[in-house]
Amino acid sequence: MTADLPDFVPDFEKTGGLVPAIAQDAVSGEVLMMAWMNEEAWHRTLTTGEAHYFSRSRGSLWHKGGTSGHTQHIRAVRLDCDSDTILLLVDQIGGAACHKGYKSCFFRELKDGEISVCSPLVFDPEEVYK
């Protein structure tokens, strides 16, 4: 998955080196997660076909699913009109994008004044991240 389009590059300079990257299920359209990408994560994502992000807490590159096996295979990449937000259309391998074990990181919902879990729990994080 390579892109040689000169204007198809996020504006990392404008955003201080990190841009938000939203992962969305390519089939269902469900939003799975939001993480950050720096230039290295962007290039690795495009060259490997799997999502790579930058972990602000660890200060390092992060291959999504590198520990859990729940990788994200890239089907398409989109940039917003200002080139400062990335949208990844992905096949979520292993069924879960969230490190807490849920299909989506957006697993909590406030609706009609009630808070509920709206995304299935796929795995036990204590078993996966030993």
Curated annotation (Swiss-Prot):
Family matches, as Pfam families: PRA-CH
Protein's name according to its UniProt entry: Phosphoribosyl-AMP cyclohydrolase
Function: Catalyzes the hydrolysis of the adenine ring of phosphoribosyl-AMP.
Binding site for Mg(2+): 80, 82, 84
Organism ancestry: Bacteria, Pseudomonadati, Thermodesulfobacteriota, Desulfovibrionia, Desulfovibrionales
Family: Belongs to the PRA-CH family.
Any single GO BP term: L-histidine biosynthetic process
GO-annotated molecular function: magnesium ion binding; phosphoribosyl-AMP cyclohydrolase activity; zinc ion binding
UniProt main location, coarse: cytoplasm
Keyword check for Amino-acid biosynthesis: yes
Cofactor(s) in the UniProt record: Mg(2+); Zn(2+)
Position of the signal peptide: none
Cofactor note text: Binds 1 Mg(2+) ion per subunit.
Organism whose genome encodes this protein: Oleidesulfovibrio alaskensis (strain ATCC BAA-1058 / DSM 17464 / G20)
Catalytic activity: 1-(5-phospho-beta-D-ribosyl)-5'-AMP + H2O = 1-(5-phospho-beta-D-ribosyl)-5-[(5-phospho-beta-D-ribosylamino)methylideneamino]imidazole-4-carboxamide
UniProt cross-references to InterPro entries, sorted A to Z: PRA-CH, PRib_AMP_CycHydrolase_dom, PRib_AMP_CycHydrolase_sf
A GO-annotated cellular component: cytoplasm
Complexes and interactors: Homodimer.
Pathway: Amino-acid biosynthesis; L-histidine biosynthesis; L-histidine from 5-phospho-alpha-D-ribose 1-diphosphate: step 3/9
EC number of this enzyme: 3.5.4.19
